[in-house]
Amino acid sequence: MKTHFAIFLITLFLFQMFSQSDAIFKAIWSGIKRLCGKRGLSDLYDLDEMFDGEISQADIDFLKELMR
């Protein structure tokens, strides 16, 4: 009975390791395909628009309203 349980645990461990590595390989492959695609390299500059280094007077007024 102990042998069956040990074989079951080893099989369960190997199956879990295989299923997790498959998900990691899929994520890596999809990232490579996204970067090397036709529009993959041109989409990298989208993050630059998210940050605006200048704060306008309207932004300061809005923050003052929030802090009241």
UniProtKB/Swiss-Prot annotation:
A cellular component term from Gene Ontology for this protein is: extracellular region
The PTM Cysteine amide maps to C36
Renumbered to this chain, the signal peptide range is 1-23
Which residues are removed as the propeptide when the protein matures?
A: 40-68
Q: What top-level branch of life does the organism fall under? A: Eukaryota
Keywords of the record: Amidation, Antimicrobial, Cleavage on pair of basic residues, Membrane, Secreted, Signal, Target cell membrane, Target membrane
State whether keyword Signal applies: yes
Locations listed in the record: Secreted; Target cell membrane
Q: Name the tissues where it is expressed.
A: Expressed by the venom gland.
Instruction: Outline what the protein does.
Output: Amphipathic peptide with antimicrobial activity.
As for family, the record states: Belongs to the non-disulfide-bridged peptide (NDBP) superfamily. Short antimicrobial peptide (group 4) family.
Spell out the note in the miscellaneous section.
Negative results: does not show antiviral activity.
* UniProt protein name: Peptide Hp1412
Q: Which organism is it from?
A: Heterometrus petersii
